[in-house]
Regions:
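Short helix-capping/linker turns of helical repeat alpha-solenoids
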Residues: 14-16, 46-48, 61-63, 82-84, ...
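Terminal, low-structured helical/coil segments at or just beyond the last alpha-helical repeat
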Residues: 226-284
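Hydrophobic face of amphipathic alpha-helices that form TPR/SEL1-like repeat modules
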Residues: 20-29, 54-61, 89-97, 122-130, ...
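Structural motif corresponding to the intra-repeat A-B loop/turn of tetratricopeptide repeats
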Residues: 30, 66, 98, 130-132, ...
Length: 284
């Protein structure tokens, strides 16, 4: 987050109008987002197509303006006509969501040939079958996307090589590792499981926890819930678990537990202890 903010601020200093809306998005600053949108709109309306894709993005996600897929498509199309690979891909992605695959494919092919990784990934996953016997097309485009450091492609290749007839766990781990380095949360979570269970690699609790925390910091809900469960266990053991009280409190709150919920859990724990003691007394 800090690095992204610094990059956006520097881009803004260098005159990149799109950085203003990105900075507003990062900082959740409505005023800055609106100012950024207005600056982009003014630029594009005056004929500067350099910002057409960014304006389409603002409309698609309602950043600084009301959400409008129709307007998003309009500006993505403007960007695509300028031979902008990102604009082509964003327009194709919206066509895919509307199940208009015939319109999406030529845009993706064109962007993919320009070596845009996400276009290559979308082409592989929407127009070829990775899990069929005839999967050469899917693998071709996924591998090209992976060569362009596309995190989703790296993750999908990791999944592909971790199961089925083509299983190659060493290769899968390599793909997951590369995807995790590019902040793919599901890849980080997979690595956490791999190191926790000692699959192919030596079992390593420290690495398992490292990748679990990385996934959680990237807002992976499954990872957050797992860390919260560990934090609750640590809390129940009066801090005898694998994290200190401050960290435990952080993950518990991150998972959405309220003070009321924690009080109820404490009551349940007390009842469980009482029942356990009674059972012991009965058996003596």
């Amino acid at each position: 987050m800090k690095e992204a903010t610094q990059v956006a601020k520097r881009a803004l200093e260098l005159g990149n109008e799109a950085a203003k809306i990105k900075l507003g998005e990062i900082q959740e600053d409505e005023k800055l987002m609106k100012a950024g949108f207005n600056a982009l709109k003014k630029k594009v309306d005056s004929g500067d197509m350099h910002y057409a894709n960014s304006l389409g993005y603002a409309y698609e996600f309602g950043i600084g303006t009301s959400l409008s897929i129709k307007e998003a498509m309009k500006y993505y199309e403007m960007a695509a006509k300028q031979n902008n690979a990102l604009g082509m891909t964003n327009l194709a992605d919206l066509y895919i969501q509307e199940d208009k695959l015939k319109k999406a494919k030529p845009l993706l092919v064109k962007a993919a040939k320009k070596e845009y990784g996400y276009a290559q990934y979308l082409l592989a996953m929407n127009f070829f079958d990775l899990y069929s016997e005839n999967n050469k097309g899917a693998l071709f485009w996924l591998e090209r996307a992976a060569n362009n450091d596309e995190p989703e492609a790296l993750y999908q290749l990791g999944v592909y090589y971790s199961e089925g007839a083509e299983a190659d766990l060493a290769k899968a781990i390599n793909y997951f590792q590369r995807a995790a380095e590019l902040n793919h949360s599901d890849a980080a979570l997979e690595l956490s499981y791999i190191y926790d269970e000692g699959i192919i690699v030596e079992q390593d609790d420290d690495k398992a926890l490292f990748f679990l925390k990385k996934a959680a910091e990237l807002d992976n809900q499954e990872a957050i819930d797992e860390l919260a469960a560990q934090a609750l266990a640590s809390r129940a053991q009066n801090g005898q678990g694998n994290m200190d009280a401050k960290e435990a409190e952080y993950w518990i709150k991150k998972a959405g537990y309220t003070e009321e919920m924690l009080k109820e859990l404490d009551k349940l724990q007390e009842k469980s202890l009482e029942m356990f003691k009674k059972m012991q007394e009965t058996n003596q």
